[in-house]
Design a protein with these regions (language model features):
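Catalytic cores and adjacent binding grooves of peptidoglycan-active enzymes
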Residues: 8, 12, 51, 92, ...
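Extracytoplasmic cell-surface/polysaccharide-interacting catalytic and binding patches
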Residues: 1-67, 139, 149-157
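Amphipathic alpha-helical interface surfaces
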Residues: 53-60, 70, 83, 99, ...
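Solvent-exposed, flexible loop/coil residues
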Residues: 25, 38, 82, 87, ...
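Extended, low-complexity, intrinsically disordered C-terminal regulatory tails
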Residues: 58-88
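Short amphipathic alpha-helical surface micro-motifs
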Residues: 55-57, 82-87, 119-126
Length: 157
């Protein structure tokens, strides 16, 4: 049984999963398949060959993809400190560690995606909701942030 299958089973049983963060190279590994739906290049950062990535994050996103049966588009994965600062990210962002992704599911609203993510991470991890709404009319789409931090954090912006 591969690591993806093992972690997915543990997540379904609500078992705390601990996986090491791996380092990839965009020049060498960009097309490497991480799960049935995701490749290294989807988590890359502009201007960086290095991609740090927590395998559990990939499993969470694959579970979301399978649950909705629709494409999951990652808009931000790993970030270098320079890129994180340029996009206004928190100095303690989980993106800097390869433990976070911002994404949207084609044709599914932010609240529905976040509610399902909550079933995967009921007592830990970060889940942020960034809806496209009257308060945020300039957003081209809404998105969800998910991360694998040890403590539980939830927010809506």
């Amino acid at each position: 049984m591969d690591i993806f299958s093992i972690v997915k089973k543990k997540l379904k049983r609500k078992v705390v999963v601990s996986i090491a963060i791996k380092e990839y190279s965009m020049s060498r590994d960009s097309t490497r398949q991480l799960s049935p739906s995701f490749r290294v290049r989807e988590f890359g950062c502009k201007g960086s060959d290095v991609v740090l990535l927590d395998e559990e994050l990939v499993v969470l996103l694959q579970c979301i993809r399978e649950h909705f049966g629709k494409p999951v588009h990652i808009t931000s994965g790993y970030r270098t400190a320079a890129h994180n600062a340029a996009v206004g990210g928190s100095k303690s962002s989980q993106h800097l560690l390869g433990r976070a992704a911002d994404f949207y599911v084609e044709g599914v609203d932010v609240a529905t995606v976040a509610a399902y993510a909550e079933t995967l991470l009921p007592s830990r991890g970060g889940i942020g909701r960034y809806p496209k709404d009257a308060k945020h009319p300039k957003r081209s789409t809404g998105w969800v942030h998910i991360d694998t931090r040890a403590n539980k954090s939830r927010w809506t912006l």
